[in-house]
């Protein structure tokens, strides 16, 4: 019984350590300032998500027509709507700028979590190697064009970070289901 509680305490302390590292490097104090994030393509994504929240969600639409650019274009017909939905949910509690930044930071945290989950040996023990690999991946600055790391996510490629995280989680659950039905 003592070994179970010792492992649980160790697991919780490891998770808290990696969460603390993320919180310290992601500057959560800046996330909760009510301003509009900028950098890279971020400004263009703000317009699209703002249109989604103000025009589409009151009508319970996921996609529709936007008159913002090019004399109008179909918005969210060919683009990933989950970040806009997440921003809408947080916008019910927080102002738009804070809700948008929470959605962006969540994508980075989800990437680290998905890499850690993919490298776990058991489902209840945190993988130190996985969490470390996730942090190294997120903090790498050498491949900003590919997305998924912090530099590209803050430049507006947060949709790619979500897709990368969901791909890792899909692989994890496929492996887990294969092992369960063996």
Kindly label every feature range from the protein language model.
Residues 1-29:
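Start-transfer (signal-anchor) and selected internal transmembrane alpha helices
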Residues 1-2, 14, 33, 116, ...:
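Glutamate identity and glutamate-enriched acidic tracts
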Residues 2-6, 120-121, 176-181:
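Positively charged n-region of N-terminal signal peptides that target proteins for export
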Residues 11-16, 125-130, 181-182:
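Membrane-interfacial loop-to-transmembrane alpha-helix junctions, especially the N-terminal start
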Residues 25-168:
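Active-site lumenal/periplasmic loops and adjacent helix-entry segments of GT-C-fold
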Residues 162-182:
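Membrane-interface transmembrane helices that cradle and orient dolichyl/undecaprenyl
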